[in-house]
Amino acid sequence: MSEKIAILSAYSFVNIEEPANLIPKLLLIGKRKYVRGTILLANEGFNGSFSGSYENVNLVLEELIKLTGPKDVNVKINYSDVHPFQKLKVRLKKEIVAMNVEGLNVDLFKGEYIEPKDWDEFITKQNVIVIDTRNDYEVEVGTFKSAISPNTKTFKQFPAWVQKNQGLLKGKRIAMVCTGGIRCEKSTSLLKSIGYDEVYHLKGGILQYLEDTQNKNNLWQGACFVFDDRRAVADDLSPVAGHWLQR
């Protein structure tokens, strides 16, 4: 039986002074280790998802951590029968997840994590609203039953939605959700920076939630859109046929 392909996703908000200098080093080790996927680098940190053998994706992650020196890294691994990526790309970006808000400090302002095992209980409490920070085409594939969708085409539209919906958010305990954790973490940072106090987010995102809970309480409906060749995954994180969506 052939070895399963490991898919490792990792991000960290950490100051990187010269991110462009890291590109050739990461490309070199990634190609040597037959790893495929995408790593985004910016002054605010890194965000990557790449596939290969379990040993090799972890070696690439170790190099990434060594080069950037973060205090905390959000990491998750799941498995596939085939590579979900075609090749390795390392790209320089202005932001590792583009929101277009100048001066946002995610280390200084961010919400409180809710562990996947505690998520169902938390979001069914009084005065809690769930905001799905993903784009409309992702939400159409699947979301939490109680979630509110901002109906954005891109994450850059999210700050404007927040500005227009202050009445909806005022006085609420706001629970943010996204695919792997990075967008909801940055979303909580935005809300905290403009004065919202009770802001929370699902640790590890929807993918970690499905892995840890298997959607046992059926609060999640549909499949989870992913940005690789699988396109969408079911409760058990297996690819879902028929969700070859355009984006």
From Swiss-Prot:
GO biological process, one term: tRNA modification
EC class (word): oxidoreductase
Substrates-to-products reaction catalysed: uridine(34) in tRNA + AH2 + O2 = 5-hydroxyuridine(34) in tRNA + A + H2O
Keyword Phosphoprotein: no
Gene3D superfamilies reported for this sequence: 3.30.70.100, Rhodanese-like domain
Keywords recorded for this protein, A-Z: Oxidoreductase, tRNA processing
An example Gene Ontology molecular-function term: oxidoreductase activity, acting on paired donors, with incorporation or reduction of molecular oxygen
Domain of life: Bacteria
InterPro entries per UniProt: Rhodanese-like_dom, Rhodanese-like_dom_sf, TrhO, TRHO_N
Active site: 178 (cysteine persulfide intermediate)
EC numbers on record: 1.14.-.-
Domain Rhodanese: 124-218
Function: Catalyzes oxygen-dependent 5-hydroxyuridine (ho5U) modification at position 34 in tRNAs.
Similarity remark: Belongs to the TrhO family.
Record-given protein name: tRNA uridine(34) hydroxylase
Organism: Rickettsia akari (strain Hartford)
Lineage of source species: Bacteria, Pseudomonadati, Pseudomonadota, Alphaproteobacteria, Rickettsiales
